[in-house]
UniProtKB/Swiss-Prot annotation:
It comes from Mus musculus. Belongs to the phospholipase A2 family. Glycans are attached at residues 37, 178, 288, 417. Major protein of the otoconia, a calcium carbonate structure in the saccule and utricle of the ear. Together with OTOL1, acts as a scaffold for otoconia biomineralization: sequesters calcium and forms interconnecting fibrils between otoconia that are incorporated into the calcium crystal structure. Together with OTOL1, modulates calcite crystal morphology and growth kinetics. It is unlikely that this protein has phospholipase A2 activity. This is Otoconin-90. Disruption phenotype: Otoconia show a strongly reduced matrix-calcium. PROSITE patterns: PA2_ASP, PA2_HIS. It is found in: Secreted. One of its GO terms (molecular function) is calcium ion binding. In the embryo, highly expressed in the developing otocyst with weak expression in the brain. Also expressed in nonsensory epithelia of both the vestibular and cochlear portions of the developing inner ear. Not expressed in adult or embryonic macular sensory epithelia. The keyword Cell inner membrane does not apply.
Length: 485
């Protein structure tokens, strides 16, 4: 059901569009609804013209939204609402302020940052009232023409979470963007005071909602929301075990265009510790070894994922996009960390490793709705000025393209730590991270690019900090020690 709703949001038809080529109901796994039709997908995403648009709006960095939302449908619903009502996209808020970034760094610094802070708190208090996110229930009604969001669900929890989102979008609509606050160094963020970190200091729920209700069915949700929010994001990615024949293709290189947000971010005086390099072409801190790799021909362009046993999946689109975005051969990524190019175990080692884990989970969700990466694909990759776009023909191909494109952009914008290439087996111990648990606890979300102080040891503490926002019951919102990005 999660993926059916995600499909609906991504692929809602435009006027005059052809019927959706949904999977044959007989091919769907047990438990998935066979009542799939056009009207099922009409709703809050009816004004989104394509899969590419919505993921382009998300941007290439994980931010504050990944810390708030635990599933694709609600995340994409919010992104569409924000885009529709405010004309803004999460990509406009990459590393914005102290609260709009993925990890809470300190007190908000402007009105938009306050929006993010209050949206976090609104969801945190909702969890305290046992109101958990249900991807099968999308209650927001978005009117793009009149730029209005309506929350009319009879379920109190649905309406509460919808109202939190409505407040956030309306807050952003009234707040301006201060571009100087993008990629703000965390050292400028002031730690939160005890008053602001206390869950009881000030409730941020919409007016009319009791702070500690004994019965969520009695929650009154009338009244306007006082919350304000600012958005930043990228979405969650994924991987698969299916088998596909290796395909050899050629790709032409183009000259680097140093205009992307990732390159700008790296150019803002950030220093990188030894062994860590950004993979974006055109960034001067790429070492000589990397330049040699970028200058040689690749043996193949498919990204190979080794599954359990002898199974192997050749992901041509992912490999081509990685090559386009970084000018590095896909095989350089295949043995990175605990999850890149393999069925991993333990906590992902860093941002790049988390991109691979997320890609695995994205493909796993596609598999559950009947879209298998191992099938012969008619998808193609367009590469121009180191910008890659995956173009699919059928609905499944478009969704699988979205998984691959998100993964490629996430991996390309992350730092490449040479010490994590082909890591010792002892570093990847324990149980594999469950996609289900990861989505619920936030372990699939990733912070934006690592700072100069980030190393291979930082992943476990990051997971703990993230659980402050997403575990039940959540701990108080606390600022991370200064010095991180």
């Amino acid at each position: 059901m999660i993926m059916l709703l995600m499909v609906g949001m991504l692929m809602a038809p435009c006027v005059g569009a052809h019927a959706l080529d949904t999977p044959n109901p007989q091919e769907l796994p047990p438990g998935l609804s066979k009542n799939i039709n056009i009207t099922f997908f009409n709703g809050v995403f009816k004004n989104v013209e394509s899969v590419a648009e919505i993921f382009d709006c998300l941007g290439s960095h994980f931010t504050w939204l990944q810390a708030v939302f635990t599933n694709f449908p609600l995340l994409l619903q919010f992104v569409n609402s924000m885009r529709c009502v405010t004309g803004l996209c999460p990509r406009d808020f990459e590393d914005y302020g102290c609260a709009c970034r993925f990890e809470m760094e300190g007190m908000p610094v402007d009105e938009s940052d306050i929006c993010c802070f209050q949206h976090r708190r609104c969801y945190e208090e909702a969890v305290e009232m046992d109101c958990l996110q249900d991807p099968a229930k999308l209650s927001a009604d978005v009117d793009c023409t009149n730029k209005q969001i309506t929350c009319e669900s009879e379920d109190p929890c649905e309406r509460l979470l919808c109202t939190c989102d409505k407040a956030a979008v309306e807050c952003l609509a009234q707040s301006g963007i201060n571009s100087s606050l993008n990629f703000l160094d965390a050292s400028f963020c002031l730690p939160q005071t005890p008053e602001t970190t206390s869950g009881k200091a000030a409730t941020l729920l919409p007016r009319g909602i009791p702070e500690k209700p004994t019965d969520t069915s009695q929650i009154a949700l009338s009244g306007e929301v006082a919350g304000e929010v600012r958005a930043d994001t990228l979405t969650t990615l994924s991987r698969t075990k299916s088998v596909q024949d290796l395909q050899d293709t050629q790709a032409s290189r183009t000259t680097s265009s140093p205009g992307s947000a990732e390159i700008i971010a790296l150019a803002k005086g950030t220093t990188h510790s030894a062994g860590i390099k950004p993979l974006r072409l055109g960034v001067s801190s790429v070492d000589n070894g990397s330049q040699e790799a970028a200058g040689k021909a690749c043996d193949r362009l498919a990204f190979v994922h080794l599954g359990d046993g002898d199974s192997m999946t050749a992901m041509l689109q992912l490999g081509e996009m990685l090559f386009c975005l970084t000018s590095h051969c896909p095989e350089e990524f295949e043995t990175y960390g605990c999850y890149c190019g393999r069925e991993g175990r333990g906590e992902p080692r860093d941002t790049l490793d988390r991109c691979c884990l997320s890609h695995h989970c994205c493909l796993e969700q596609m598999r559950q709705v009947g879209c298998l990466h191992g099938r012969r694909s008619q998808s193609s990759v367009v590469c121009e000025d180191h910008m890659a776009k995956c173009v699919g023909q059928s609905l499944c191909e478009k969704l699988l393209c979205a998984c691959d494109q998100m993964a490629a952009e996430c991996m390309a914008s992350a730092f490449f730590n040479q010490s994590l290439k082909s890591p010792d087996g002892a570093e990847c111990q324990g149980e594999p991270v469950s996609c289900e648990d990861g989505m619920l606890q936030g372990t699939l979300a990733s912070s934006v690019d690592s700072s100069s102080e980030e190393n291979s040891e930082e992943a476990p503490p990051q997971m703990e900090r993230l659980r402050r926002f997403l575990e039940k019951p959540p701990g108080p919102l606390g600022a991370r020690p200064l010095g991180g990005k």
